A protein has these predicted regions:
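Non-catalytic accessory segments adjacent to catalytic cores
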Residues: 10-118, 134, 156
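Short, hydrophobic/proline-enriched secondary-structure or compact coil segments at domain edges
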Residues: 2-12
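Secondary-structure boundary elements
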Residues: 93-101, 126-127, 138-141, 153-158, ...
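Secondary-structure transition/turn motif
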Residues: 11-12, 50-54, 147-149, 163-167
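Short, structured patches in soluble enzyme cores that scaffold and shape functional sites
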Residues: 38-40, 107-109, 136-140, 146-148, ...
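Cytosolic ligand/metal-binding cores
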Residues: 19, 30-32, 153-186
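SIR2/sirtuin-family catalytic core signature
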Residues: 113-155
Length: 186
């Protein structure tokens, strides 16, 4: 049985890793690292995962924590362009009406089966230099990905972050407190 974990890249060949078991909570607890692991629709009432231990290390050191597994065998369910196209067209029309200034189209592709985390983690250093990796494995499901937006950066004994899509100026922060706004912004 593989131990639950979550990671986020913090620099070239540096990754912050949280190891399970994770404590689930509705809010992040001050003074402790936490990972926001929620479903896409933000329906989980306890999306924050506080690891029992954490560390920062290289991708190679992280990959070495995993035993070589069996060959990955995943059955993929491809995204449906027939479902996506009308939603995308609707979003473009809303932008033209001035309802949105930016949209982030999303397609879902999911797979079932087994993966070899060691192999995936060993491949992460070969990502293009402008891509930043993140992922988790938690209670028999997981995700691994990369984004062109730097999520966190090691800075001395701490971490720095940047504003991401969906953020608001501080003067408009109260708008994010309503559930409807939170779902439309996040």
């Amino acid at each position: 049985m593989q131990r639950d974990f979550a990671f986020i890249q913090t620099g070239p060949d540096r990754v912050f890793v949280g190891w399970g078991p994770f404590e689930q909570a509705p809010m992040r607890r001050p003074g402790r690292p936490a990972f926001f692991i929620a479903d896409f629709f933000l329906d989980d009432p306890h999306p924050w995962r506080h690891p029992s231990s954490w560390e920062e290390l290289s991708f190679a050191a992280l990959a070495a924590r995993f035993q070589p597994g069996e060959s990955a065998q995943v059955t993929w369910t491809p995204p449906s362009i027939d479902e996506f196209a009308p939603l995308f067209e609707s979003a473009i029309a809303a932008m033209h009406r001035g309802e949105f200034r930016k949209i982030v189209p999303v397609l879902f592709e999911s797979g079932t089966g087994r993966i070899d985390w060691r192999v995936l983690l060993e491949r992460l250093p070969s990502l293009p230099p402008h891509m930043w990796a993140y992922g988790y494995s938690y209670q028999s499901h997981g995700l691994i990905g990369a984004t062109p937006e730097l999520l966190f950066r090691s800075q001395g004994r701490g971490y720095a972050t940047m504003a991401l899509a969906g953020t608001r100026p501080i003067a408009r922060a109260a708008e994010l407190l309503s559930d409807a706004d939170r779902k439309s912004v996040v």
